[in-house]
């Protein structure tokens, strides 16, 4: 195989991610020609509606997957937090890259952190997961929907439309963006989204030539952790329309630790728990933890959220 086409979204961050994979491929295979195919997804077109109200899964991947299925592209680069639980039957994940910082970042031009924000401060985010955890910490905060690419969000902050905004740390680091006050929120305060910080390479199952190309990029520990998180999410049948968080780490030798959270969007109820299992049980730990949270009351929260939506 001498040439490969990578499908990607067109945002600056998505383009950075696709170019990163392109560079890794060309370092490993100097003979390989790599082209990028930019595709606009439904999620890119709808910028005036919070994600929780758009509905549907795969908002940022469906059109890209169609390019894979038609053969227009050989592979696709995704942020793993955007990848739906169920992939089309013909597609699979060829690799999950080593995870970047999975946390969320607080950014402000006046205030050093969440606790220093004034009463009733305006905080920008369209993530119900972030909203719920912020309000659990500071019920007085006014959460304002904030969509658009990273540059747009940062520009709105610098124009003082918000007292602070919350974004994924990985994206900020990858693009080298700065604000007067920036601080990563610890997982004890803001548990990350499932898959946050990792990149996934999606390909057709039958394309053995493409699968083999990406084997060197698969990071074993990250792969196990992301699979456990996604299994947890699948057990809850959740998506970006529900305040769910899940984060797994290899906490000891051959031991995987998974922490999960389901919350009411107003932060008034937070159900959180964790499990440890041997890495060999990574595919079992997610479903087990989801059942524990459902038994602890997450089922009522999820039912009420689906009724609202």
From Swiss-Prot:
Documented EC number(s): 2.5.1.61
Required cofactor names: dipyrromethane
Superkingdom, natural source: Bacteria
Pathway: Porphyrin-containing compound metabolism; protoporphyrin-IX biosynthesis; coproporphyrinogen-III from 5-aminolevulinate: step 2/4
Subunit structure: Monomer.
Family: Belongs to the HMBS family.
Record's function text: Tetrapolymerization of the monopyrrole PBG into the hydroxymethylbilane pre-uroporphyrinogen in several discrete steps.
Note: The porphobilinogen subunits are added to the dipyrromethane group.
Protein's UniProt name: Porphobilinogen deaminase
Organism: Lawsonia intracellularis (strain PHE/MN1-00)
Organism lineage string: Bacteria, Pseudomonadati, Thermodesulfobacteriota, Desulfovibrionia, Desulfovibrionales
């Amino acid at each position: 195989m001498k040439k490969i086409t990578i499908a990607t979204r067109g945002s600056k961050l998505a383009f950075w991610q696709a170019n990163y994979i392109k560079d890794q491929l060309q370092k490993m295979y100097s003979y390989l020609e790599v082209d990028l195919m930019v595709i606009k997804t439904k999620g890119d077109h709808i910028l005036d509606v919070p994600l929780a109200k758009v509905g549907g899964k795969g908002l940022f991947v469906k059109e890209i997957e169609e390019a894979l299925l038609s053969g227009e592209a050989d592979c696709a680069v995704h942020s793993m937090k955007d990848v739906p639980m169920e992939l089309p039957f013909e597609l699979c994940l060829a690799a999950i890259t080593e995870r970047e910082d999975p946390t969320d970042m607080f950014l402000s031009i006046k205030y050093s952190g969440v606790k220093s924000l004034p009463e009733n401060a305006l905080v920008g985010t369209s993530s119900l997961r972030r909203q719920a955890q912020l309000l659990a910490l500071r019920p007085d905060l006014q959460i304002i929907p904030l969509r658009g690419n990273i540059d747009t969000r940062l520009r709105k902050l610098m124009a003082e439309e918000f007292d602070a905004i919350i974004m994924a740390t990985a994206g900020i680091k990858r693009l080298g963006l700065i604000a007067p006050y920036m601080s990563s929120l610890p997982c004890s305060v803001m548990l990350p989204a499932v898959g946050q910080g990792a990149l996934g390479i999606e390909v057709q199952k039958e394309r053995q030539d493409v699968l083999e190309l990406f084997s060197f990029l698969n990071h074993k520990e990250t792969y196990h952790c992301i699979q456990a998180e996604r299994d947890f999410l699948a057990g809850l049948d959740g998506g970006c329309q529900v305040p769910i968080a899940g984060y797994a780490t290899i906490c000891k030798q051959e031991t995987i630790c998974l922490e999960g959270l389901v919350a009411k969007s107003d932060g008034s109820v937070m159900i959180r728990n964790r499990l440890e299992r041997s890495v060999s049980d990574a595919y079992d730990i997610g479903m087990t933890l989801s059942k524990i949270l459902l038994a602890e009351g997450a089922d009522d929260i999820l039912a009420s959220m689906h009724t609202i939506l």
